[in-house]
Amino acid sequence: MAKKSKVKKTLVDQILDKAKIDHDSLSFNGLEGELPEDVARESIYKNLALNGDKTGPVIGIVPITEHLSEKKLAKISGNKKVQMIPQKDLQKTTGYVHGANNPVGIRQKHNFPIYIDQSAQEAGFLIVSAGEIGRSIRINSQDLADFVNAEFADIKE
């Protein structure tokens, strides 16, 4: 009888397990192909890393179906303007490659301000990257915000 292959936990899963924060591990690529039946595209959030002119790096988390308002994020984060960190500098800044940025891992390594669009708070949960491409977590929005010291705000266009 063949052994059932067990999916290896990501570092984000391990951190959340150690902190006893309830979450579901998911394996799919939200930007490509079919989604699992129980996953709505609007519940998947992207983690965007930007540079503020006053604060330095700042993280904005919005649904993949929406666009981030740089103007709103700048205002809420105490900057005059923010701009996306160039992809070539992303891993050096956050520790993650494009598509694997996640609030849990970033908070463990850096003290960057993190802002989550208020739509996640209204929905009650969100799906974000688990630190590896093709791996995600479904987590209670407030639990995530509390754990990574994030603030909910209106940051989408």
Label for each model-derived stretch:
Residues 1-157:
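Extended, low-hydrophobicity, polar/charged segments
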